[in-house]
């Protein structure tokens, strides 16, 4: 988070969301858990990482957000990391699985909002 003094901490996704949500017309979902030993992220399904995905999507949907949501799984491959290799089928399956997980998370959130 370059808005903080050095040494900069990792950006807090919820804090960031609170500053941009009124200007957001698109939500891009990628979730992960930071591994300081590797100095890199372990990517997860949406809502399973430290990206506050559930909280952010719930806030957005409860506030009437009805625009686009895109995914960037990084589970099978990472475009900027040549060390991760996967077949075309594995990449395809990863995107489908990630999309289904996001759909399930959104359905859960919608039920939570309805029951609130």
Regions found by a protein language model. Give the residues of each.
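Histidine-acidic metal/acid-base catalytic patches
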Residues: 2-116
């Amino acid at each position: 988070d370059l808005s903080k003094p050095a040494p900069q901490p990792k950006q807090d996704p919820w804090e960031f969301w609170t500053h941009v949500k009124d200007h957001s017309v698109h939500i891009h979902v990628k979730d992960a858990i930071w591994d300081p030993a590797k100095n890199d992220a372990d990517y997860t399904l949406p809502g399973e990482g430290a990206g506050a995905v559930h909280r952010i999507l719930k806030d957005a949907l409860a506030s009437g957000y009805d625009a686009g949501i895109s995914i960037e799984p990084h589970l099978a491959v990472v475009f900027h990391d040549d060390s991760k290799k996967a077949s075309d089928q594995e990449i395809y399956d990863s995107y489908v699985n990630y999309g289904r997980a996001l759909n399930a998370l959104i359905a859960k959130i919608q039920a939570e909002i309805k029951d609130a």
